[in-house]
From Swiss-Prot:
Database matches in Gene3D superfamilies: 3.30.300.20, P-loop containing nucleotide triphosphate hydrolases (3.40.50.300)
InterPro entries found in the cross-reference section: G_ENGA, GTP-bd, GTPase_Der, KH_dom-like, KH_dom-like_a/b, P-loop_NTPase, Small_GTP-bd
Keyword tags: GTP-binding, Nucleotide-binding, Repeat, Ribosome biogenesis
Positions of GTP 2 binding: 181-188, 229-233, 294-297
Coiled coil regions in record: none
One family name in Pfam for this protein: KH_dom-like
Gene Ontology biological process terms, A to Z: ribosome biogenesis
Protein name, entry field: GTPase Der
Taxonomic source organism: Streptococcus pyogenes serotype M3 (strain ATCC BAA-595 / MGAS315)
Annotated residues for binding of GTP 1: 10-17, 57-61, 119-122
Gene: der
Length: 436
């Protein structure tokens, strides 16, 4: 399901990040907070009144070297392109400023709903001062103290009220995948080469994101695919399009919509920090993964080159031991014909269900190989396990005490399940739960 997007904009020092953190921590529950994947907390997924939405702090995308007005102009432009709802944050302590008026004139031209949040209204006496903000022409101002959590519920109510109608569930028989990677790794060439394969019938269809065009195609076996286009990564003429943080945000949105993510690496440049950050987000989101090394035709090779690359990738992406690696060339089409079948296999792994009886046989065999650990004389007891969901496959292991299930033993059980049932290209989640 594609989540609607809420963007927070405003000049520096009005409390955008504080409001972001207040909303994100207010349960509104954080469903997937990607702090640690991006250096700045610019993106989270939350819920209010049973509606989920993606939350973006556009302040985290600023180019600090750009002129002040250019920075806030870029914020507003990003918000208008990306968001279904915009939260425009101003400061009740400082009143209406020239910068506020500048942003309001930009936002006034958009058809996107704008919610005016007057922050730093930290005591009741200040509420009378918010009426000055009617002059911005953006409707009723909402008094907020993000530091104290006052008024955030009203802002959230307004956000939910203005979110678009929920879309129908997408066809689960269609496999959705995206190609993610830094600029110049050859994503566009790969897309064109994949769609140029003789066994692929392609047609562009309107995407569900604001400006993306997804491509729907069917392979020779009749399997339908949707290739999710990270359009913003390739658009030209926009200064902020080239910033890494903006690219990260675009990649995150594509990952959210994907069943399988193809992490594209440039063989000429090797692995960069950006690659690991984006791959980490896809892993945490439970997506199927393929590591695609492109431009394989462009480097010198010997009998050891593949082995060296595989060893380096496994070392750099230690959390992606399950992800297959494929070396391709968009230029010569080397191994591109293998990608659709590989994507299909990983999608099957994502949707695989294991009968409880068979699963518990594997668990019991694992315990026989490596007995459960003890802590302070008390031994972990595993009663039974069951699979509770797919995409990714998720298992609950019922135990006597959750605290006795050490991370290393949970990882051991995961490895035993993988050895028994393969699960190619997909993370699997194991959760220890006390039996009631």
């Amino acid at each position: 399901m594609v989540l609607p997007t809420v963007a927070i904009v405003g000049r520096p020092n009005v409390g955008k990040s504080t409001l972001f953190n207040r909303i994100a921590g207010e349960r509104i529950s954080i469903v997937e907070d990607v702090e640690g994947v991006t250096r700045d907390r610019i993106y989270a997924t939350g819920e209010w009144l049973n509606r989920q939405f993606s939350l973006i702090d556009t302040g985290g995308i600023d180019d600090v070297d750009a002129p002040f007005m250019e920075q806030i102009k870029h914020q507003a432009q990003i918000a208008m392109e990306e968001a279904d709802v915009i939260v425009f944050v101003v400061s009740g302590k400082e009143g209406v400023t020239d910068a506020d008026e500048y942003v309001s004139k930009i936002l006034y031209r958009t058809n996107t709903p704008v919610i005016l949040a007057v922050n730093k209204v930290d005591n009741p006496e200040m509420r009378n001062d918010i009426y000055d903000f009617y002059s911005l022409g953006l409707g009723d101002p909402y008094p907020v103290s993000s530091v104290h959590g006052i008024g955030t519920g009203d802002v959230l109510d307004a956000i939910v009220e203005n979110l678009p109608v929920e879309e129908a569930e997408e066809n689960d028989d269609i496999i959705r995948f995206s190609l993610i990677g830094r600029p110049n790794v050859g994503k566009s060439s790969l897309i064109n080469a994949i769609l140029g394969e003789d066994r692929v019938i392609a047609s562009p269809v309107a995407g569900t994101t604001r400006d993306a065009i997804d491509t729907h195609f069917t392979d020779a076996d009749g399997q339908e695919f949707t290739m999710i286009d990270t359009a913003g990564m390739r658009k030209s003429g926009k200064i902020y399009e080239n910033t890494e943080k903006y690219s990260v945000m675009r990649a995150m949105r594509a990952i959210d919509r994907s069943d399988v993510v193809l992490m594209v690496i440039n063989a000429e440049e090797g692995i960069r920090e950006y690659d690991k950050r984006i791959a980490g987000f896809a892993h945490e989101a439970g997506k199927g993964m393929i590591i695609v090394v492109n431009k394989w035709d462009a480097i010198d090779k010997d009998n050891h080159t593949v082995a060296k690359w595989e060893a380096d990738i496994r070392d750099q992406f230690q959390f992606l031991t399950y992800a297959p690696i494929i070396f391709v060339s968009a230029l010569t089409k080397q191994r591109l014909n293998k990608l659709p079948d590989l994507i299909k296999r990983i999608s099957e792994s994502q949707n695989k269900r294991i009968p409880s009886a068979v699963l518990n046989d594997v668990i019991m065999d694992a315990i026989a190989i490596n007995p459960t650990p003890t802590d302070k004389g008390k031994r972990l007891k595993i009663f039974y396990a069951t699979q509770v969901s797919v995409k990714p496959p998720t298992f609950v292991v019922f135990v006597n005490e959750e605290e006795l299930m050490h991370f290393s033993y949970l990882r051991f059980l995961e490895n035993q399940i993988r050895a028994a049932f393969t699960f190619e290209g997909t993370p699997i989640h194991l959760i220890a739960r006390k039996r009631k």
